[in-house]
């Protein structure tokens, strides 16, 4: 078996995995990235690209006041003791430094001043400014040849499946701002008039979100001369007699190769959402492969490689976590858009309303699973809306009716989407919940007219209102009164799993006794998330992935980052 040697070997090529070798090369380490698939970028390339960064450099520009103790207290309350204080503090202290380094290597971000933290009722939350969105990236900087090796973004995140839109533009459109019409027109004109670029590739020259982040990282990696292999799946980790991880065995060009690592191996290969066996073993039931993220090949290979000696939590406590999302079933959509929009009512099969007060939206599928476990028919649930909503809004995989009328709805979707001219007929889609759904939908319409949700207080906080319709009395409540009426099945799914190998504050993997495994580091969805079961704000996946990669590289080069505020550890909040 052929052997090669590097200082650092990184498994995976998402944001955290791609970020680490750039920093390591700058620090004088010889690095190698091994990617299982034929494309670089992982699920980071499919994401919105946001990062949750307390105390970030753009908060002052956005007019947001923040301080470390407040941010630490908020995050500590969110994780509810399921992540150690020192990891939480390490994240809050280091995230802003990581974001500043991103800016230095040509990947600037801007704070989203109006995008609130996901738990506005928890002390220490902020009404905006902690979530950052990547600045647009010109794909020409990456070159077309390199662009073709990068995973493309999902069509659902683009205008008409082609044109890139930023989080700011998406908010403008969904909020019905007048300027959004001109924004859409400008995006379309710029795309179609860019003949020189469109003759080279169908991809938009203007890259936003996760595409902008990953393209920026790949550009920086090329500049730093990071060696990157695709089609090179991890097969084994190599340990010496003392238990230190000294390298990996990968399969490349049909042959196994051992690659030795002088400083360490960093696992950043994502979650296990494409592995039905692991889903059945660790995730809450029911768990269907079709409701997971359909993109990529997250089979948990790196989880399995380290699981023999790494700490993954008793009884799946750590491995059983996921970034929940709503699914329309049948693999139709990675995201279920519009779940909390005005004019939408969610109901369980027994008729009770879905707990749409649960924030963030990932709380809805978690609540569905909990209700289902009690025998209350929480899975699947139903989303109900009327013709007025359908005409103007996307819902799950459906584009607005003004763009895709009912006659053009794909036949393969018809077992999941129902519509009838009279309201009572749609309840035939699920007879067991018919009466209760009618009552709860009627009550929601009454609340919309009054402008107050007496059940769940939708629209009662800044997070709800961000994507609301300002033309309504309550921006998050709309009536369901104009036929035809629509019902769509709603399944609990996940954008990705976030349970994995347990690490310390430097990203070092711990063994089953809680001791450090020398030479082995882990970040992102490959590790047990510092957010535990929570999601502090938009960007709570990519932010920690890159921040702990930052700390891991510092540890590898012998310059570990000390905690600057140890007096906060153990403090009651």
Curated annotation (Swiss-Prot):
Membrane topology: Peripheral membrane protein
PANTHER family attached to this UniProt entry: 3-OXOSTEROID 1-DEHYDROGENASE (PTHR43400:SF10), FUMARATE REDUCTASE (PTHR43400)
Function, as annotated: Dehydrogenates steroids by introducing a double bond in steroid ring A.
E.C. code: 1.3.99.4
Name of the molecule in the record: 3-oxosteroid 1-dehydrogenase
Entry binding sites for FAD: 7-36
UniProt pathway: Lipid metabolism; steroid degradation
SUPFAM superfamilies found in the cross-reference section: FAD/NAD(P)-binding domain, Succinate dehydrogenase/fumarate reductase flavoprotein, catalytic domain
GO BP, sorted A to Z: steroid catabolic process; steroid metabolic process
UniProtKB keywords: Cell inner membrane, Cell membrane, FAD, Flavoprotein, Lipid metabolism, Membrane, Oxidoreductase, Steroid metabolism
Localization per record: Cell inner membrane
Catalysed conversion reaction: a 3-oxosteroid + A = a 3-oxo-Delta(1)-steroid + AH2
Cofactor(s) annotated in UniProt: FAD
Domain of life: Bacteria
UniProt similarity note: Belongs to the FAD-dependent oxidoreductase 2 family. 3-oxosteroid dehydrogenase subfamily.
Cellular-component GO terms for this entry: plasma membrane
Gene3D superfamilies: FAD/NAD(P)-binding domain, Succinate dehydrogenase/fumarate reductase flavoprotein, catalytic domain
GO molecular function: 3-oxosteroid 1-dehydrogenase activity
Lineage: Bacteria, Pseudomonadati, Pseudomonadota, Betaproteobacteria, Burkholderiales
């Amino acid at each position: 078996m052929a052997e090669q040697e590097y200082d650092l070997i990184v498994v995976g090529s998402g944001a955290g995995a791609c970020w680490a070798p750039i920093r390591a090369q700058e620090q004088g380490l010889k690095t190698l990235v091994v990617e299982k698939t034929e494309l670089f970028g992982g699920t980071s390339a499919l994401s919105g690209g946001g990062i949750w960064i307390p105390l970030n450099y753009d908060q002052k520009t956005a007019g947001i006041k923040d301080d470390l103790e407040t941010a630490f207290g908020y995050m500590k309350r969110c994780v509810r003791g399921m992540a150690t204080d020192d990891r939480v503090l390490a994240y809050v202290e280091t995230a802003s430094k990581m974001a500043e380094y991103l800016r230095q290597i040509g990947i600037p971000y801007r704070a989203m001043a109006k995008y609130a933290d996901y738990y506005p009722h928890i002390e220490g939350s902020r009404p905006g400014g902690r979530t950052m969105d990547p600045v647009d990236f010109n794909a020409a900087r990456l070159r077309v040849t390199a662009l073709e090796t990068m995973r493309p973004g999902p069509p659902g995140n683009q205008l008409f499946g082609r044109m890139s839109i930023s989080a700011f533009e998406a908010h403008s459109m969904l909020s019905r701002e007048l300027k959004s019409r001109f924004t859409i027109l400008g995006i379309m004109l710029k795309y179609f008039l860019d003949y020189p670029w469109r003759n080279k590739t169908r991809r938009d020259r203007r890259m936003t979100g996760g595409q902008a982040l990953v393209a920026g990282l790949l550009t920086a990696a090329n500049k730093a001369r990071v060696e990157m292999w695709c089609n090179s799946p991890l097969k084994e980790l190599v340990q010496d007699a003392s238990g230190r991880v000294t390298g990996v065995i990968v399969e490349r060009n049909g042959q196994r190769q051992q690659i030795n690592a002088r400083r360490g191996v960093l696992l950043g290969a994502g979650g296990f959402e494409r592995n039905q066996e692991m889903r059945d073993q660790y995730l809450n039931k029911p768990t269907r492969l079709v409701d997971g993220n359909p993109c990529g090949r997250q089979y948990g290979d790196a989880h399995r490689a380290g699981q023999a000696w790494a700490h993954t939590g008793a009884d799946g406590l750590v491995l059983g976590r996921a970034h929940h999302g709503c699914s329309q079933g049948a693999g139709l959509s990675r995201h279920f858009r519009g779940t909390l929009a005005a004019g939408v009512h969610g109901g369980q099969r027994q008729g009770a309303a879905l707990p749409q007060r649960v924030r963030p939206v990932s709380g809805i599928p978690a609540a569905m699973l909990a209700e289902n476990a009690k025998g209350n028919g929480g899975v699947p649930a139903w989303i109900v809306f009327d013709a007025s909503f359908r005409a103007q809004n996307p819902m799950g995989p459906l584009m607005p009716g003004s763009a895709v009328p009912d006659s053009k709805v794909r036949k393969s979707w018809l077992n999941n989407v129902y519509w009838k001219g009279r309201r009572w007929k749609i309840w035939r889609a699920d007879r067991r919940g018919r009466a209760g759904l009618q009552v709860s939908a009627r009550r929601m319409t009454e609340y919309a007219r009054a402008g107050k949700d007496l059940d769940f207080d939708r629209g009662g906080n800044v997070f709800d209102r961000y994507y609301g319709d300002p033309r309504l009395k309550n921006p998050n409540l709309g009536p369901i009164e104009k036929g035809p009426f629509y019902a769509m099945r709603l399944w609990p799914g996940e954008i990705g799993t976030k349970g994995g190998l347990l690490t310390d504050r430097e990203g070092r993997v711990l063994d089953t006794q809680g001791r450090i495994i020398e030479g082995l580091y882990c970040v992102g969805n490959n590790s047990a998330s510092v957010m535990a079961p929570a999601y502090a704000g938009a960007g709570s996946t990519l932010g920690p992935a890159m921040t702990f990669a930052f700390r891991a590289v510092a540890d590898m080069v012998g310059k570990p980052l000390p905690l600057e505020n140890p007096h906060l550890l153990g403090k009651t909040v």
